[in-house]
Protein backbone atom coordinates (compact mmCIF):
# COMPACT_ATOMS: atom_id res chain seq x y z
CA UNK A 1 0.00 0.00 0.00
CA UNK A 2 1.11 3.57 -0.62
CA UNK A 3 0.35 6.25 1.95
CA UNK A 4 2.64 9.02 0.73
CA UNK A 5 -0.31 11.20 -0.10
CA UNK A 6 -1.16 11.44 3.61
CA UNK A 7 2.26 11.98 5.14
CA UNK A 8 2.84 15.05 7.30
CA UNK A 9 6.53 15.72 7.46
CA UNK A 10 8.87 13.49 9.42
CA UNK A 11 6.45 11.54 11.60
CA UNK A 12 6.30 7.85 12.47
CA UNK A 13 3.64 7.18 9.89
CA UNK A 14 5.86 8.66 7.18
CA UNK A 15 8.65 6.38 8.34
CA UNK A 16 6.33 3.40 8.20
CA UNK A 17 5.31 4.45 4.71
CA UNK A 18 8.93 4.49 3.63
CA UNK A 19 9.31 1.00 5.04
CA UNK A 20 6.33 -0.17 3.03
CA UNK A 21 7.66 1.32 -0.21
CA UNK A 22 10.88 -0.66 -0.24
CA UNK A 23 11.80 -3.01 -3.07
CA UNK A 24 9.35 -1.35 -5.49
CA UNK A 25 10.65 -2.55 -8.82
CA UNK A 26 10.96 -6.21 -7.96
CA UNK A 27 7.60 -6.51 -6.26
CA UNK A 28 5.57 -4.50 -8.71
CA UNK A 29 6.79 -6.80 -11.44
CA UNK A 30 5.94 -9.98 -9.52
CA UNK A 31 2.21 -9.54 -9.97
CA UNK A 32 1.29 -7.85 -6.66
CA UNK A 33 -2.08 -6.26 -7.48
CA UNK A 34 -2.99 -2.92 -6.00
CA UNK A 35 -5.54 -0.17 -6.16
CA UNK A 36 -6.12 3.26 -4.74
CA UNK A 37 -5.02 5.42 -7.68
CA UNK A 38 -1.28 4.58 -7.58
CA UNK A 39 0.60 3.82 -10.78
CA UNK A 40 1.76 0.26 -11.12
CA UNK A 41 5.43 0.99 -11.71
CA UNK A 42 5.82 3.27 -8.69
CA UNK A 43 3.93 1.36 -6.03
CA UNK A 44 6.94 0.03 -4.15
CA UNK A 45 10.08 1.99 -4.86
CA UNK A 46 13.08 2.64 -2.59
CA UNK A 47 16.46 4.15 -3.14
CA UNK A 48 18.07 1.75 -0.66
CA UNK A 49 18.10 -2.04 -0.55
CA UNK A 50 19.69 -3.58 2.53
CA UNK A 51 19.33 -7.34 2.70
CA UNK A 52 21.58 -9.71 4.62
CA UNK A 53 23.11 -12.69 2.88
CA UNK A 54 20.92 -15.12 4.77
CA UNK A 55 17.90 -13.03 4.00
CA UNK A 56 18.79 -12.98 0.31
CA UNK A 57 18.83 -16.80 0.29
CA UNK A 58 15.42 -16.91 1.92
CA UNK A 59 14.09 -14.33 -0.52
CA UNK A 60 15.41 -16.29 -3.52
CA UNK A 61 13.81 -19.41 -2.12
CA UNK A 62 10.52 -17.57 -1.82
CA UNK A 63 10.69 -16.06 -5.33
CA UNK A 64 11.23 -19.51 -6.85
CA UNK A 65 7.70 -20.58 -5.83
CA UNK A 66 4.93 -20.38 -8.49
CA UNK A 67 2.26 -17.68 -8.09
CA UNK A 68 -1.29 -18.49 -9.09
CA UNK A 69 -2.35 -14.93 -9.71
CA UNK A 70 -5.25 -16.13 -11.80
CA UNK A 71 -7.01 -16.90 -8.55
CA UNK A 72 -6.48 -13.47 -7.05
CA UNK A 73 -9.58 -11.34 -6.80
CA UNK A 74 -9.77 -7.60 -6.52
CA UNK A 75 -12.40 -6.45 -4.07
CA UNK A 76 -14.03 -3.04 -3.89
CA UNK A 77 -12.09 -0.41 -2.04
CA UNK A 78 -12.98 -0.07 1.64
CA UNK A 79 -12.25 2.67 4.21
CA UNK A 80 -8.87 2.70 5.85
CA UNK A 81 -10.17 1.99 9.31
CA UNK A 82 -11.91 -1.26 8.46
CA UNK A 83 -9.71 -2.56 5.69
CA UNK A 84 -6.39 -2.04 7.37
CA UNK A 85 -7.45 -3.60 10.61
CA UNK A 86 -9.04 -6.62 8.98
CA UNK A 87 -6.62 -7.10 6.12
CA UNK A 88 -3.43 -6.74 8.08
CA UNK A 89 -4.70 -8.13 11.35
CA UNK A 90 -6.46 -11.07 9.71
CA UNK A 91 -5.42 -12.11 6.23
CA UNK A 92 -1.98 -10.69 6.39
CA UNK A 93 -0.99 -12.64 9.43
CA UNK A 94 -2.26 -16.00 8.18
CA UNK A 95 1.18 -16.67 6.75
CA UNK A 96 2.38 -20.13 5.98
CA UNK A 97 6.09 -19.96 6.78
CA UNK A 98 6.92 -23.56 5.93
CA UNK A 99 9.05 -22.39 3.05
CA UNK A 100 11.22 -20.36 5.41
CA UNK A 101 11.56 -23.24 7.83
CA UNK A 102 12.68 -25.51 5.01
CA UNK A 103 15.51 -23.13 4.16
CA UNK A 104 17.16 -23.52 7.53
CA UNK A 105 16.94 -22.02 10.99
CA UNK A 106 18.93 -18.89 10.22
CA UNK A 107 19.19 -15.79 12.33
CA UNK A 108 16.89 -13.98 9.89
CA UNK A 109 14.25 -16.72 10.34
CA UNK A 110 14.45 -16.67 14.11
CA UNK A 111 14.00 -12.92 14.18
CA UNK A 112 10.95 -13.26 11.93
CA UNK A 113 9.38 -15.80 14.30
CA UNK A 114 10.15 -13.73 17.36
CA UNK A 115 8.44 -10.67 15.96
CA UNK A 116 5.30 -12.36 14.59
CA UNK A 117 3.38 -11.69 17.75
CA UNK A 118 4.62 -8.11 17.79
CA UNK A 119 3.38 -7.58 14.27
CA UNK A 120 -0.02 -8.94 15.22
CA UNK A 121 -0.37 -6.42 17.99
CA UNK A 122 0.85 -3.69 15.68
CA UNK A 123 -1.77 -4.52 13.03
CA UNK A 124 -4.57 -4.56 15.58
CA UNK A 125 -3.50 -1.21 16.96
CA UNK A 126 -3.27 0.17 13.42
CA UNK A 127 -6.83 -1.01 12.80
CA UNK A 128 -8.21 0.73 15.87
CA UNK A 129 -6.27 3.90 15.21
CA UNK A 130 -7.28 3.86 11.54
CA UNK A 131 -10.91 3.54 12.51
CA UNK A 132 -10.64 6.53 14.76
CA UNK A 133 -9.07 8.57 12.01
CA UNK A 134 -11.74 7.47 9.54
CA UNK A 135 -14.44 8.63 11.92
CA UNK A 136 -12.80 12.04 12.19
CA UNK A 137 -12.60 12.40 8.39
CA UNK A 138 -8.83 12.59 8.65
CA UNK A 139 -7.98 10.31 5.70
CA UNK A 140 -10.13 9.60 2.70
CA UNK A 141 -7.90 7.25 0.71
CA UNK A 142 -8.91 3.62 0.29
CA UNK A 143 -7.04 0.34 0.47
CA UNK A 144 -7.90 -2.78 -1.54
CA UNK A 145 -6.64 -6.04 -0.06
CA UNK A 146 -6.13 -9.33 -1.84
CA UNK A 147 -8.10 -11.88 0.16
CA UNK A 148 -7.18 -15.21 -1.45
CA UNK A 149 -6.08 -17.18 1.60
CA UNK A 150 -4.98 -20.10 -0.57
CA UNK A 151 -2.28 -18.02 -2.19
CA UNK A 152 -0.46 -16.02 0.47
CA UNK A 153 2.94 -15.94 -1.17
CA UNK A 154 2.62 -12.35 -2.47
CA UNK A 155 2.18 -11.15 1.11
CA UNK A 156 5.45 -12.59 2.42
CA UNK A 157 7.80 -10.15 0.69
CA UNK A 158 5.75 -7.32 2.15
CA UNK A 159 6.47 -8.51 5.70
CA UNK A 160 10.12 -9.19 4.89
CA UNK A 161 10.63 -5.72 3.42
CA UNK A 162 9.32 -4.08 6.56
CA UNK A 163 11.62 -6.23 8.67
CA UNK A 164 14.71 -5.54 6.56
CA UNK A 165 14.17 -1.78 6.54
CA UNK A 166 13.64 -1.84 10.29
CA UNK A 167 17.01 -3.48 10.72
CA UNK A 168 18.68 -1.00 8.36
CA UNK A 169 17.40 1.95 10.34
CA UNK A 170 18.30 0.40 13.64
CA UNK A 171 14.70 0.08 14.78
CA UNK A 172 13.74 -2.49 17.36
CA UNK A 173 10.18 -3.33 16.41
CA UNK A 174 9.57 -5.55 19.39
CA UNK A 175 9.98 -2.58 21.76
CA UNK A 176 8.25 0.10 19.67
CA UNK A 177 5.09 1.47 21.19
CA UNK A 178 3.11 1.71 17.97
CA UNK A 179 -0.09 2.63 19.72
CA UNK A 180 1.47 5.69 21.32
CA UNK A 181 2.96 6.88 18.07
CA UNK A 182 -0.32 6.48 16.20
CA UNK A 183 -2.21 8.25 18.96
CA UNK A 184 0.26 11.11 18.75
CA UNK A 185 0.00 11.28 14.98
CA UNK A 186 -3.80 11.06 15.07
CA UNK A 187 -4.00 13.92 17.53
CA UNK A 188 -1.63 16.03 15.44
CA UNK A 189 -3.52 15.50 12.20
CA UNK A 190 -6.93 15.87 13.82
CA UNK A 191 -5.94 19.14 15.42
CA UNK A 192 -4.73 20.52 12.12
CA UNK A 193 -7.81 19.40 10.20
CA UNK A 194 -10.19 20.65 12.84
CA UNK A 195 -8.44 23.97 12.77
CA UNK A 196 -8.79 24.20 9.00
CA UNK A 197 -12.42 23.16 9.10
CA UNK A 198 -13.18 25.74 11.71
CA UNK A 199 -11.34 28.36 9.71
CA UNK A 200 -13.35 27.47 6.62
CA UNK A 201 -16.63 27.64 8.49
CA UNK A 202 -15.62 30.95 9.97
CA UNK A 203 -14.80 32.32 6.52
CA UNK A 204 -18.09 31.07 5.16
CA UNK A 205 -20.00 32.69 7.97
CA UNK A 206 -18.10 35.92 7.43
CA UNK A 207 -18.84 35.80 3.68
CA UNK A 208 -22.53 35.25 4.31
CA UNK A 209 -22.64 38.18 6.71
CA UNK A 210 -20.87 40.40 4.18
CA UNK A 211 -23.28 39.35 1.44
CA UNK A 212 -26.23 40.09 3.68
CA UNK A 213 -24.77 43.49 4.54
CA UNK A 214 -24.23 44.26 0.86
CA UNK A 215 -27.81 43.36 0.04
CA UNK A 216 -29.04 45.57 2.84
CA UNK A 217 -26.91 48.49 1.60
CA UNK A 218 -25.79 49.50 -1.89
CA UNK A 219 -25.68 46.11 -3.63
CA UNK A 220 -29.41 45.60 -3.23
CA UNK A 221 -29.99 48.61 -5.42
CA UNK A 222 -27.67 47.23 -8.11
CA UNK A 223 -29.40 43.87 -7.96
CA UNK A 224 -32.83 45.41 -8.39
CA UNK A 225 -31.55 47.54 -11.25
CA UNK A 226 -30.10 44.52 -13.04
CA UNK A 227 -33.30 42.54 -12.51
CA UNK A 228 -35.35 45.37 -13.98
CA UNK A 229 -33.10 45.51 -17.05
CA UNK A 230 -33.52 41.78 -17.63
CA UNK A 231 -37.26 42.03 -17.20
CA UNK A 232 -37.50 44.93 -19.65
CA UNK A 233 -35.43 42.96 -22.15
CA UNK A 234 -37.81 40.00 -21.90
CA UNK A 235 -40.79 42.26 -22.44
CA UNK A 236 -39.13 43.82 -25.48
CA UNK A 237 -38.36 40.41 -26.97
CA UNK A 238 -41.98 39.37 -26.49
CA UNK A 239 -43.23 42.47 -28.28
CA UNK A 240 -40.79 41.86 -31.12
CA UNK A 241 -41.97 38.28 -31.47
CA UNK A 242 -45.56 39.47 -31.73
CA UNK A 243 -44.56 41.94 -34.40
CA UNK A 244 -42.66 39.20 -36.22
CA UNK A 245 -45.83 37.13 -36.23
CA UNK A 246 -47.77 39.94 -37.87
CA UNK A 247 -44.99 40.46 -40.39
CA UNK A 248 -44.92 36.74 -41.14
CA UNK A 249 -48.66 36.68 -41.79
CA UNK A 250 -48.32 39.69 -44.07
CA UNK A 251 -45.44 37.98 -45.82
CA UNK A 252 -47.54 34.87 -46.43
CA UNK A 253 -50.14 37.07 -48.07
CA UNK A 254 -47.51 38.73 -50.21
CA UNK A 255 -47.42 37.48 -53.79
CA UNK A 256 -43.67 37.87 -54.24
CA UNK A 257 -42.94 35.81 -51.12
CA UNK A 258 -45.41 33.18 -52.25
CA UNK A 259 -43.60 32.85 -55.54
CA UNK A 260 -40.11 32.69 -54.09
CA UNK A 261 -40.58 30.73 -50.87
CA UNK A 262 -43.41 28.45 -51.91
CA UNK A 263 -41.82 27.65 -55.25
CA UNK A 264 -43.95 29.88 -57.45
CA UNK A 265 -42.73 31.67 -60.54
CA UNK A 266 -43.22 35.40 -61.07
CA UNK A 267 -44.88 35.15 -64.46
CA UNK A 268 -44.82 38.82 -65.27
CA UNK A 269 -41.23 39.37 -64.15
CA UNK A 270 -39.65 37.82 -67.25
CA UNK A 271 -40.70 38.74 -70.74
CA UNK A 272 -39.58 36.90 -73.81
CA UNK A 273 -36.38 38.36 -75.24
CA UNK A 274 -36.23 38.28 -79.01
CA UNK A 275 -33.09 37.93 -81.04
CA UNK A 276 -31.92 40.98 -82.90
CA UNK A 277 -34.63 41.54 -85.54
CA UNK A 278 -32.05 42.82 -88.00
CA UNK A 279 -30.35 39.40 -87.92
CA UNK A 280 -33.57 37.42 -88.45
CA UNK A 281 -33.76 36.38 -92.08
CA UNK A 282 -37.44 35.40 -91.72
CA UNK A 283 -38.61 38.72 -90.39
CA UNK A 284 -40.32 39.85 -93.58
CA UNK A 285 -41.43 36.41 -94.74
CA UNK A 286 -45.24 36.07 -94.63
CA UNK A 287 -44.91 32.29 -94.26
CA UNK A 288 -42.57 32.41 -91.30
CA UNK A 289 -44.81 30.22 -89.09
CA UNK A 290 -45.13 27.49 -91.72
CA UNK A 291 -41.38 27.57 -92.31
CA UNK A 292 -40.77 27.09 -88.61
CA UNK A 293 -43.08 24.08 -88.47
CA UNK A 294 -41.33 22.51 -91.47
CA UNK A 295 -37.93 23.07 -89.86
CA UNK A 296 -39.12 21.40 -86.64
CA UNK A 297 -40.59 18.40 -88.40
CA UNK A 298 -37.57 17.80 -90.62
CA UNK A 299 -34.98 17.94 -87.84
CA UNK A 300 -33.42 21.25 -88.79
CA UNK A 301 -31.52 23.37 -86.32
CA UNK A 302 -33.82 24.46 -83.53
CA UNK A 303 -32.27 27.91 -83.57
CA UNK A 304 -33.43 28.32 -87.18
CA UNK A 305 -36.97 27.26 -86.28
CA UNK A 306 -36.99 29.66 -83.33
CA UNK A 307 -36.11 32.56 -85.61
CA UNK A 308 -39.00 31.65 -87.91
CA UNK A 309 -41.48 31.58 -85.02
CA UNK A 310 -40.16 34.86 -83.66
CA UNK A 311 -40.73 36.43 -87.07
CA UNK A 312 -44.29 35.10 -87.12
CA UNK A 313 -44.95 36.58 -83.67
CA UNK A 314 -43.55 39.93 -84.71
CA UNK A 315 -46.02 39.90 -87.57
CA UNK A 316 -48.89 38.81 -85.27
CA UNK A 317 -48.24 39.21 -81.51
CA UNK A 318 -51.42 37.23 -80.72
CA UNK A 319 -50.44 34.16 -82.71
CA UNK A 320 -51.15 31.50 -80.09
CA UNK A 321 -49.68 28.56 -81.98
CA UNK A 322 -46.54 30.52 -82.80
CA UNK A 323 -46.03 31.27 -79.10
CA UNK A 324 -46.62 27.60 -78.28
CA UNK A 325 -44.19 26.31 -80.90
CA UNK A 326 -41.63 28.92 -79.96
CA UNK A 327 -41.77 27.89 -76.30
CA UNK A 328 -41.39 24.19 -77.10
CA UNK A 329 -38.50 24.83 -79.50
CA UNK A 330 -36.61 27.02 -77.06
CA UNK A 331 -36.93 24.49 -74.25
CA UNK A 332 -35.65 21.71 -76.50
CA UNK A 333 -32.83 24.00 -77.56
CA UNK A 334 -31.66 24.34 -73.93
CA UNK A 335 -33.11 27.86 -73.57
CA UNK A 336 -35.49 27.09 -70.72
CA UNK A 337 -36.21 30.59 -69.43
CA UNK A 338 -37.11 32.02 -72.81
CA UNK A 339 -39.22 28.96 -73.55
CA UNK A 340 -41.14 29.37 -70.28
CA UNK A 341 -41.85 33.01 -71.08
CA UNK A 342 -43.21 32.04 -74.51
CA UNK A 343 -45.49 29.36 -73.04
CA UNK A 344 -46.76 31.70 -70.35
CA UNK A 345 -47.61 34.24 -73.04
CA UNK A 346 -49.44 31.50 -74.91
CA UNK A 347 -51.56 30.77 -71.83
CA UNK A 348 -52.39 34.43 -71.43
CA UNK A 349 -53.78 34.37 -74.94
CA UNK A 350 -55.37 30.92 -74.58
CA UNK A 351 -55.99 29.97 -70.92
CA UNK A 352 -57.20 26.48 -71.89
CA UNK A 353 -54.22 25.42 -73.98
CA UNK A 354 -53.46 21.93 -72.65
CA UNK A 355 -50.15 21.56 -74.47
CA UNK A 356 -48.83 24.80 -73.00
CA UNK A 357 -49.93 23.76 -69.49
CA UNK A 358 -48.22 20.38 -69.76
CA UNK A 359 -44.92 21.76 -71.05
CA UNK A 360 -44.97 24.61 -68.53
CA UNK A 361 -45.41 22.15 -65.66
CA UNK A 362 -42.34 20.27 -66.85
CA UNK A 363 -40.29 23.46 -67.08
CA UNK A 364 -41.45 24.63 -63.64
CA UNK A 365 -40.21 21.39 -62.10
CA UNK A 366 -36.91 21.67 -63.97
CA UNK A 367 -36.40 25.18 -62.61
CA UNK A 368 -37.55 24.40 -59.06
CA UNK A 369 -40.96 26.09 -59.15
CA UNK A 370 -42.71 23.08 -57.66
CA UNK A 371 -45.80 24.88 -56.38
CA UNK A 372 -46.38 26.49 -59.75
CA UNK A 373 -45.97 23.06 -61.33
CA UNK A 374 -48.58 21.53 -59.00
CA UNK A 375 -51.05 24.31 -59.75
CA UNK A 376 -50.42 23.95 -63.47
CA UNK A 377 -50.98 20.19 -63.35
CA UNK A 378 -54.17 20.74 -61.40
CA UNK A 379 -55.26 23.28 -63.97
CA UNK A 380 -54.48 20.84 -66.78
CA UNK A 381 -56.51 18.04 -65.18
CA UNK A 382 -59.42 20.36 -64.42
CA UNK A 383 -59.43 21.56 -68.03
CA UNK A 384 -59.12 18.14 -69.65
CA UNK A 385 -61.43 16.34 -67.22
CA UNK A 386 -63.87 19.01 -66.02
CA UNK A 387 -65.98 18.11 -63.01
CA UNK A 388 -63.88 15.09 -62.11
CA UNK A 389 -62.90 16.60 -58.77
CA UNK A 390 -63.05 19.90 -56.95
CA UNK A 391 -59.87 21.77 -57.79
CA UNK A 392 -60.80 24.57 -55.37
CA UNK A 393 -59.38 22.50 -52.51
CA UNK A 394 -55.89 23.19 -53.82
CA UNK A 395 -56.52 26.92 -53.60
CA UNK A 396 -57.15 26.73 -49.86
CA UNK A 397 -54.99 27.82 -46.97
CA UNK A 398 -51.39 28.53 -47.70
CA UNK A 399 -50.25 26.74 -44.58
CA UNK A 400 -51.28 23.50 -46.29
CA UNK A 401 -48.93 23.95 -49.23
CA UNK A 402 -46.76 21.02 -48.14
CA UNK A 403 -49.78 18.72 -48.50
CA UNK A 404 -50.62 19.78 -52.04
CA UNK A 405 -48.20 17.29 -53.55
CA UNK A 406 -49.78 14.34 -51.77
CA UNK A 407 -53.27 15.56 -52.69
CA UNK A 408 -52.31 15.94 -56.34
CA UNK A 409 -50.73 12.50 -56.39
CA UNK A 410 -53.83 10.85 -54.94
CA UNK A 411 -56.07 12.63 -57.44
CA UNK A 412 -54.04 11.59 -60.46
CA UNK A 413 -53.88 8.02 -59.21
CA UNK A 414 -57.65 8.08 -58.86
CA UNK A 415 -57.88 9.48 -62.37
CA UNK A 416 -55.72 6.65 -63.71
CA UNK A 417 -57.93 4.05 -62.04
CA UNK A 418 -61.15 5.50 -63.47
CA UNK A 419 -59.95 5.62 -67.07
CA UNK A 420 -60.05 2.29 -68.85
CA UNK A 421 -57.28 3.04 -71.36
CA UNK A 422 -53.78 4.32 -70.69
CA UNK A 423 -53.56 8.07 -71.24
CA UNK A 424 -49.92 9.04 -71.96
CA UNK A 425 -50.60 12.58 -70.77
CA UNK A 426 -51.92 11.38 -67.42
CA UNK A 427 -48.92 9.09 -67.07
CA UNK A 428 -46.70 12.07 -67.84
CA UNK A 429 -48.37 14.26 -65.20
CA UNK A 430 -48.25 11.52 -62.60
CA UNK A 431 -44.62 10.85 -63.43
CA UNK A 432 -43.85 14.54 -62.95
CA UNK A 433 -45.35 14.44 -59.47
CA UNK A 434 -43.20 11.46 -58.56
CA UNK A 435 -40.18 13.14 -60.14
CA UNK A 436 -40.68 16.28 -58.04
CA UNK A 437 -40.71 14.09 -54.93
CA UNK A 438 -37.52 12.24 -55.98
CA UNK A 439 -39.43 8.99 -56.47
CA UNK A 440 -37.57 8.17 -59.64
CA UNK A 441 -38.47 4.49 -59.80
CA UNK A 442 -42.16 5.31 -59.90
CA UNK A 443 -41.45 8.06 -62.40
CA UNK A 444 -39.74 5.53 -64.67
CA UNK A 445 -42.78 3.25 -64.48
CA UNK A 446 -45.08 6.08 -65.57
CA UNK A 447 -42.90 7.16 -68.48
CA UNK A 448 -42.44 3.59 -69.67
CA UNK A 449 -46.21 3.12 -69.61
CA UNK A 450 -46.60 6.24 -71.75
CA UNK A 451 -43.97 4.99 -74.23
CA UNK A 452 -45.89 1.76 -74.71
CA UNK A 453 -48.71 3.84 -76.13
CA UNK A 454 -46.49 6.18 -78.14
CA UNK A 455 -43.02 4.65 -78.63
CA UNK A 456 -41.88 7.38 -81.05
CA UNK A 457 -42.19 10.26 -78.61
CA UNK A 458 -38.66 11.67 -78.46
CA UNK A 459 -39.62 13.99 -75.62
CA UNK A 460 -40.76 11.08 -73.49
CA UNK A 461 -37.56 9.16 -74.24
CA UNK A 462 -35.56 12.15 -73.04
CA UNK A 463 -37.64 12.38 -69.86
CA UNK A 464 -37.15 8.68 -69.26
CA UNK A 465 -33.40 9.12 -69.68
CA UNK A 466 -33.36 11.94 -67.13
CA UNK A 467 -35.23 9.78 -64.62
CA UNK A 468 -32.85 6.87 -65.17
CA UNK A 469 -29.85 9.16 -64.75
CA UNK A 470 -31.22 10.48 -61.47
CA UNK A 471 -31.57 6.88 -60.33
CA UNK A 472 -27.83 6.33 -60.93
CA UNK A 473 -28.57 4.16 -63.96
CA UNK A 474 -26.39 6.05 -66.41
CA UNK A 475 -25.99 3.21 -68.91
CA UNK A 476 -29.74 2.83 -69.32
CA UNK A 477 -30.12 6.60 -69.49
CA UNK A 478 -27.64 6.74 -72.37
CA UNK A 479 -29.72 4.23 -74.29
CA UNK A 480 -32.85 6.34 -73.77
CA UNK A 481 -31.07 9.51 -74.93
CA UNK A 482 -29.78 7.74 -78.03
CA UNK A 483 -33.32 6.67 -78.85
CA UNK A 484 -34.52 10.28 -78.50
CA UNK A 485 -31.74 11.47 -80.82
CA UNK A 486 -32.57 8.78 -83.35
CA UNK A 487 -36.08 10.17 -83.50
CA UNK A 488 -34.88 13.80 -83.52
CA UNK A 489 -31.15 14.42 -84.15
CA UNK A 490 -31.52 18.17 -83.56
CA UNK A 491 -32.75 17.61 -79.99
CA UNK A 492 -30.14 19.72 -78.19
CA UNK A 493 -31.38 18.99 -74.67
CA UNK A 494 -31.22 15.23 -75.22
CA UNK A 495 -27.69 15.62 -76.57
CA UNK A 496 -26.68 17.70 -73.58
CA UNK A 497 -28.14 15.11 -71.20
CA UNK A 498 -26.30 12.41 -73.12
CA UNK A 499 -23.03 14.27 -72.59
CA UNK A 500 -23.64 14.52 -68.84
CA UNK A 501 -24.38 10.80 -68.55
CA UNK A 502 -21.26 10.02 -70.57
CA UNK A 503 -19.24 12.08 -68.09
CA UNK A 504 -20.73 10.11 -65.22
CA UNK A 505 -19.30 6.86 -66.59
CA UNK A 506 -15.92 8.38 -67.49
CA UNK A 507 -16.41 8.68 -71.27
CA UNK A 508 -15.04 12.22 -71.48
CA UNK A 509 -14.11 12.23 -75.16
CA UNK A 510 -17.61 11.15 -76.16
CA UNK A 511 -19.09 13.75 -73.80
CA UNK A 512 -17.00 16.49 -75.44
CA UNK A 513 -18.18 15.41 -78.88
CA UNK A 514 -21.83 15.54 -77.82
CA UNK A 515 -21.38 19.02 -76.34
CA UNK A 516 -19.56 20.34 -79.39
CA UNK A 517 -22.35 18.96 -81.58
CA UNK A 518 -24.94 20.73 -79.43
CA UNK A 519 -22.98 23.99 -79.65
CA UNK A 520 -22.82 23.70 -83.41
CA UNK A 521 -26.60 23.36 -83.49
CA UNK A 522 -26.97 26.72 -81.77
CA UNK A 523 -25.28 28.42 -84.71
CA UNK A 524 -27.61 29.73 -87.38
CA UNK A 525 -26.50 30.53 -90.87
CA UNK A 526 -24.73 33.87 -91.04
CA UNK A 527 -24.93 34.52 -87.30
CA UNK A 528 -21.22 34.83 -86.59
CA UNK A 529 -20.55 36.60 -89.87
CA UNK A 530 -23.09 39.27 -88.95
CA UNK A 531 -21.71 39.56 -85.43
CA UNK A 532 -18.17 39.93 -86.69
CA UNK A 533 -19.19 43.08 -88.57
CA UNK A 534 -20.55 44.72 -85.45
CA UNK A 535 -18.71 47.35 -83.52
CA UNK A 536 -15.56 46.31 -81.71
CA UNK A 537 -17.06 47.74 -78.54
CA UNK A 538 -19.38 44.72 -78.35
CA UNK A 539 -17.60 41.87 -76.59
CA UNK A 540 -18.12 38.21 -77.30
CA UNK A 541 -20.04 37.88 -74.05
CA UNK A 542 -22.70 40.24 -75.43
CA UNK A 543 -23.46 38.22 -78.54
CA UNK A 544 -26.49 36.60 -76.92
CA UNK A 545 -27.68 39.68 -75.04
CA UNK A 546 -30.76 40.05 -77.22
CA UNK A 547 -32.20 36.83 -75.86
CA UNK A 548 -31.67 37.79 -72.23
CA UNK A 549 -30.12 34.37 -71.69
CA UNK A 550 -26.88 33.03 -73.11
CA UNK A 551 -27.98 29.70 -74.61
CA UNK A 552 -24.48 28.24 -74.51
CA UNK A 553 -23.84 28.87 -70.81
CA UNK A 554 -24.70 25.35 -69.68
CA UNK A 555 -23.02 23.80 -72.68
CA UNK A 556 -19.82 25.82 -72.31
CA UNK A 557 -19.51 25.24 -68.57
CA UNK A 558 -20.06 21.53 -69.01
CA UNK A 559 -17.50 21.43 -71.82
CA UNK A 560 -14.98 23.10 -69.50
CA UNK A 561 -15.56 20.44 -66.87
CA UNK A 562 -15.01 17.75 -69.49
CA UNK A 563 -11.67 19.23 -70.55
CA UNK A 564 -10.62 19.58 -66.91
CA UNK A 565 -11.46 15.91 -66.33
CA UNK A 566 -9.41 15.03 -69.42
CA UNK A 567 -6.48 17.09 -68.14
CA UNK A 568 -6.51 19.20 -71.29
CA UNK A 569 -5.76 22.70 -70.07
CA UNK A 570 -4.76 23.66 -73.61
CA UNK A 571 -8.32 23.01 -74.78
CA UNK A 572 -9.81 24.63 -71.71
CA UNK A 573 -8.29 27.98 -72.62
CA UNK A 574 -10.09 27.94 -75.96
CA UNK A 575 -13.61 27.63 -74.54
CA UNK A 576 -15.44 30.94 -74.64
CA UNK A 577 -18.69 32.32 -76.09
CA UNK A 578 -18.53 32.78 -79.86
CA UNK A 579 -15.49 30.52 -80.25
CA UNK A 580 -14.62 28.95 -83.56
CA UNK A 581 -15.74 25.33 -83.26
CA UNK A 582 -13.60 24.22 -86.20
CA UNK A 583 -10.50 24.36 -83.99
CA UNK A 584 -11.73 21.22 -82.19
CA UNK A 585 -12.44 19.14 -85.28
CA UNK A 586 -8.90 17.76 -85.45
CA UNK A 587 -9.44 15.86 -82.19
CA UNK A 588 -13.20 15.41 -81.93
CA UNK A 589 -15.86 14.18 -84.31
CA UNK A 590 -19.01 16.28 -84.34
Curated annotation (Swiss-Prot):
UniProt crosslink position (Glycyl lysine isopeptide (Lys-Gly) (interchain with G-Cter in ubiquitin)): 18
BP term (GO), one: protein import into peroxisome matrix, docking
Residue stretches of biased makeup (Polar residues): 18-30
PTM remark: Monoubiquitinated at Cys-6 by PEX2 during PEX5 passage through the retrotranslocation channel: monoubiquitination acts as a signal for PEX5 extraction and is required for proper export from peroxisomes and recycling. When PEX5 recycling is compromised, polyubiquitinated at Lys-18 by PEX10 during its passage through the retrotranslocation channel, leading to its degradation.
InterPro entries (UniProt xref): PEX5/PEX5L, TPR-like_helical_dom_sf, TPR_rpt
Region of interest: Amphipathic helix 1 (AH1): 7-29
Keyword RNA-binding assigned: no
Molecular function GO labels: peroxisome matrix targeting signal-1 binding; protein carrier chaperone; protein-macromolecule adaptor activity
Region Disordered: start-end pairs: 18-45
Pfam families named in the record: TPR_16 (PF13432)
Positions of transmembrane segments: none
Stated family: Belongs to the peroxisomal targeting signal receptor family.
Function per UniProt: Receptor that mediates peroxisomal import of proteins containing a C-terminal PTS1-type tripeptide peroxisomal targeting signal (SKL-type). Binds to cargo proteins containing a PTS1 peroxisomal targeting signal in the cytosol, and translocates them into the peroxisome matrix by passing through the PEX13-PEX14 docking complex along with cargo proteins. PEX5 receptor is then retrotranslocated into the cytosol, leading to release of bound cargo in the peroxisome matrix, and reset for a subsequent peroxisome import cycle.
Oligomer status and interactors: Interacts (via WxxxF/Y and LVxEF motifs) with PEX14; promoting translocation through the PEX13-PEX14 docking complex.
Protein name according to UniProt: Peroxisomal targeting signal receptor
Organism name: Candida glabrata (strain ATCC 2001 / BCRC 20586 / JCM 3761 / NBRC 0622 / NRRL Y-65 / CBS 138)
